[in-house]
A protein has these predicted regions:
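Sec-dependent N-terminal signal peptides
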Residues: 3-12
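Amphipathic alpha-helical scaffolding segments comprising HEAT/armadillo-like alpha-solenoid repeats
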Residues: 11-17, 37-49, 68-80, 100-119, ...
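N-terminal segments that cap or nucleate solenoid repeat domains
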Residues: 14-58, 62
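Alpha-helix N-cap/helix-start positions at coil->helix boundaries
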Residues: 23-24, 38, 53-54, 69, ...
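Alpha-solenoid repeat junctions
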Residues: 33-37, 63, 67, 94, ...
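Solenoidal tandem-repeat scaffolds enriched in leucines and small polar residues
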Residues: 123, 127, 146, 153-159, ...
Length: 426
């Protein structure tokens, strides 16, 4: 009887604190509740409706600190608040449930508030995304979509757009497209990156109006997204952007986009740009030839692979040669050169996407399987990811072997990649 009495007293004491007339005391009570962990989640809910913004902010911070799936309902509710700081913190908290640690690098970690004015600072790093097998609750995507479309501030909207990209929120694409018409560079950029991460080709035609945007950063991102989504219909607009490029960055992005679209009509453009002085222009031209898959172009690309000194264009030439059918696995061949790139942190981000694209073809996967036995630790880890993204049923034995590798890091990635691949397969 005594323990029950003490519990009832504790609950009444907490409720009494929450009803305190002093907002500072109510905020203090919320912070104390957060220390109780998941059990405090239902008791924090009333504070999300507190008339004082400071108390509501503390309630959201407490939910984010507690974390875990049980906070989702309350965080979705908090995302509907009309205060930008609360919206930003709720957004980061929602993402953090699915990508633990996100809140440490999210926008809420760089917020400052003076009265009703909330200032924040976005980082340029935006390369995070959940694993494809992670299932996000629909109401989370709906809540973030509403924020991207009409949050309380442009920062809150941009932060929600970034979150949708991290969570691969396909159902919120209409909200992201609406955000692209905001005329705010930050929001437009984050929305483009999100569309790119989601990777739905049906969204591509709806971003074409940005291919001639006057802001270089927006135009470059629109060109990159158009290429990655393989929007064939936009090829004339991309060619126009290439011929009227105001900067080298726009020119690179336009040629790279044409290289990804891979229209045979652009063959002469690729040949012409193979001899350009700029490394990235030569690289994009080689990639375009690789994707056109004209066997005769091996004679053009092969000398480039042999003689090229720039790392970027040489990796691109290696990609092109493998795409054109050069599948030998010797130590000086193009496929091994791409694998070598996986060992270097500075070039892994170039070599890995090439291999992910190439591994969609079964003959190339067979060559990769043959090379796994002699692969380094980094190569095994990265090739696990490649096969998880582009493999088929024939990749299961290779990933099962990697999941049992003596190296713990290799085995861990093998298990994770095996799970990703199985989730992808019909």
């Amino acid at each position: 009887m005594k323990p029950l009495f003490l519990l009832s007293f504790a609950v009444l004491f907490t409720v009494g604190q929450a009803q305190d007339a002093d907002p500072k005391q109510r905020a203090r009570s919320v912070r104390d509740l957060a220390k109780q962990g998941e059990d405090a989640i239902p008791r924090l809910a009333p504070s999300l409706s507190d008339p004082d913004i400071g108390v509501r902010v503390e309630a959201v911070k407490a939910l984010v600190e507690i974390g875990g799936p049980k906070t989702l309902d309350s965080l979705v509710r908090a995302a509907a608040d009309n205060d930008p700081e609360i919206q930003i913190r709720a957004t980061d908290g929602l993402v953090n449930v699915y990508l633990p640690g996100y809140v440490k690098t999210g926008l809420s970690g760089r917020l400052s508030r003076v009265g009703s004015t909330v200032t924040s600072k976005f980082t340029d790093t935006n390369d995070q995304a959940i694993d494809p097998f992670v299932q996000v609750r629909p109401e989370v995507i709906v809540a973030l979509g509403k924020l991207a479309r009409g949050g309380a501030s442009l920062d809150a909207r941009a932060n929600a757009a970034r979150a949708l990209g991290v969570l691969r929120g396909r159902d919120a694409i209409p909200d992201l497209i609406e955000a692209l018409r905001s005329k705010d560079d930050k929001l437009m950029y984050e929305s483009l990156v999100a569309v790119q991460k989601i990777g739905d080709p049906s969204a591509a035609p709806r971003i074409s109006f940005l291919l001639r945007d006057l802001d270089e950063k927006i135009q470059v991102e629109a060109l990159e997204t158009t290429g990655l989504l393989r929007n064939q219909e936009a090829a004339p607009q991309v060619r126009d952007a290439l011929s009227h490029a105001r900067t080298i960055k726009v020119r690179r992005a336009a040629l790279a986009a044409l290289g990804m679209i891979a229209d045979p009509a652009d063959h002469a453009i690729f040949i012409q740009n193979l001899s350009e002085k700029d490394d990235l222009i030569r690289a994009a031209a080689a990639e375009g030839l690789g994707r056109l898959k004209n066997p005769a172009d091996r004679a053009v690309v092969s000398p480039m692979f042999t003689n090229e000194r720039g790392m970027n264009p040489r990796l691109s030439a290696a990609f092109a040669l493998v795409s054109l059918g050069e599948l030998n696995t010797d130590r000086y061949g193009p496929l091994q050169y791409l694998l070598n790139g996986l060992n270097q942190r500075s070039w892994r981000g170039v070599a890995s996407p090439f291999l992910i694209e190439l591994a969609r073809e079964e003959p190339i996967r067979q060559s990769i399987y043959a090379m796994l036995g002699m692969a380094t630790k980094d190569e095994k880890i990265q090739l696990s990811i490649v096969l998880s993204r582009s493999g088929d049923r024939d990749s299961l034995p290779a990933l099962e072997t990697l999941s049992k590798d003596p190296d713990a890091d290799v085995a861990a990635e093998g298990i994770r990649s095996l799970r990703t691949l199985r989730a992808r397969l019909p």
